[in-house]
Amino acid sequence: MGEHSPDDNIIFFKGEEDDLTPHDKMLRFVDDNGLVPSSSGTVYDRTTVLIEQDPGTLEDDEDDGQCGEPLPFLVEGEEGFLIDQEAMSQGYVQHIISPDQIHLTINPGSTPMPRNIEGATLTLQSECPETKRKEVKRYQCTFEGCPRTYSTAGNLRTHQKTHRGEYTFVCNQEGCGKAFLTSYSLRIHVRVHTKEKPFECDVQGCEKAFNTLYRLKAHQRLHTGKTFNCESQGCSKYFTTLSDLRKHIRTHTGEKPFRCDHDGCGKAFAASHHLKTHVRTHTGERPFFCPSNGCEKTFSTQYSLKSHMKGHDNKGTAYSALPQHNGSEDTNHSLYLSELGLLSTDSELQENSSSTQDQDLSTISPAIIFESMFQNSDDPGIQDDPLQTAALIDSFNGDAESVIDVPPPAGNSASLSLPLVLQSGISEPPQPLLPATAPSAPPPAPSLGPGSQPAAFGSPPALLQPPEVPVPHSTQFAANHQEFLPHPQAPPQTIVPGLSVVAGAPASAATVASAVAAPAPPQSTTEPLPAMVQTLPLGANSVLTNNPTITITPTPNTAILQSSLVMGEQNLQWILNGATSSPQNQEQIQQASKVEQVYFATAVPVASGTGSSVQQIGLSVPVIIIKQEEACQCQCACRDSAKERAAGRRKGCSSPPPPEPNPQPPDGPSLQLPP
């Protein structure tokens, strides 16, 4: 092989004569163009220099292969480099060394050659006449510790700008501010804002279009079947780009070549963009700005910015009152929580609730409690939109007249919370409720299973006071998901004053009648509220595909629910799995969402089970919050390992045994799940 450059020595190869070899065809091509062929026909060396305009773009991980890879302009199936002259769009210079002469061929190609040769990229390819093996000179990055190589000097120069931080081309679109290494990359990025997609697929029946030729060619591999397939045993995945295949192979090998060089960190990643996102946790960089007027929030990832922008887009409907539904309309969308990202986390609720502990109970209004749950925190990445909060409070106050009037209780003696039941489908009859009996001793704390915190649904010592022991990771609901009773659209329940409804199943008519006939226990200082059962159908959800319902059963003397009650991720997961009975939806569950925090919010509008007017049940409506996992944004193969790890964690989850049912007094909260 021979490689010729100003710094290389000339290496000659002696080849045997062969009348049918591709280089003889090249000699005929040279002869047709007026050059004198060699008398012997023997070629010692053939070197081609490709002259191309510097593209100024560098696809991530697309050109980092090892030495010896063919260049993209080579014609598949051809043995010679320049046999098919029409397929060579770039200009080239070729010289052929023979025993008695040197042939020099200059072809400008079908695309214009650069006017200034200094702005061009010269790619050298050499072919051994004996073995017909071609070799492309690779350009090695000279920065210490960088193993990247490139087939063109232009791509190498672009890559080296990443080491120097030369992101000089900045997007001037409002609210963007992204910077790029080359002007070409900036032009491609602007098409994201303008929605321009000039490269359309020409396959009949396919209407897809793309903003770059690179993405179009990758898409067309799906039509031609020339994809990059994973050859690992048992893996049948395929990809449209070589870089995606390389990233996927790392999920099999466990290779993580991108390592954080900050002191004391040492974390490694399989993809370079994951490392870039991680480095921002050290530097505190937040390059993504919210473009909305009056919003000065910044974010470290584009995913976080998009999640935040949904709050601005849905500002008029995110927390507004429910739309008016006729009795015949579908009520699956009666629970509106379209923007879950703006709700406070459990730690924020504990911190914010302490500010209202010293207030007089008679002065605490629903709006004050609700506003305290949405107060802004110091972290700009998780701050809540004040306009969104104001709209939410207004929507609550707008329906305040429909809330049942509650006389203020004396002191802090009575503070109860709400049980919660998830039900789906129809398979078994509901279990009868235990009769309410008057207590002869102080009511014991409800039994919630091993490892649970008794403060989950117990009466707190003071109103709005968080529990002494945090419970974000405790087991709050101890039962197997198969034991949840399926529940049809329940008819409205009879309102019975002084009745304590036990969570687990709707109260039957016989149970209600027996409870009415029994004498009511003596009350202390407060007037009991009528207990009611409200069935809420959940909206359509990618996880809860069977539209399970939430049965909310307030107990008498209901007050304000503690804002720091948390259900563990493990326990909620089997609730979701139980609600999703279709086996074909398991893959959807694995990819759809991740339970990050579960806590109880207040003042959420709900709809009546009979389709009547919108009604709000005080301040004690429990809500399950499912936050979307912040996953990789790149649509790349590096997400495969994360899916496998998530599936492994779900297989290892085991639910604790169900607790024994215990009768509860009327004044105490009840949490009893069906056997």
Curated annotation (Swiss-Prot):
The modification N-acetylglycine is found at G2. InterPro entries: Zinc_finger_trans_reg, Znf_C2H2_sf, Znf_C2H2_type. One of its GO terms (molecular function) is cis-regulatory region sequence-specific DNA binding. The keyword Transmembrane does not apply. Signal peptide: none annotated. Ubiquitously expressed. It holds the Pfam family zf-C2H2. GO terms for biological process: cartilage homeostasis; cellular response to zinc ion; DNA-templated transcription; positive regulation of DNA-templated transcription; positive regulation of transcription by RNA polymerase II; response to cadmium ion; response to oxidative stress. It comes from the Eukaryota. One of its GO terms (cellular component) is nucleus. Keywords: Acetylation, Activator, Cytoplasm, DNA-binding, Metal-binding, Nucleus, Phosphoprotein, Repeat, Transcription, Transcription regulation, Zinc, Zinc-finger. A motif (Nuclear localization signal) lies at residues 132-137. Disulfide bonds: none annotated. It is found in: Nucleus; Cytoplasm. This is Metal regulatory transcription factor 1. It comes from Mus musculus.
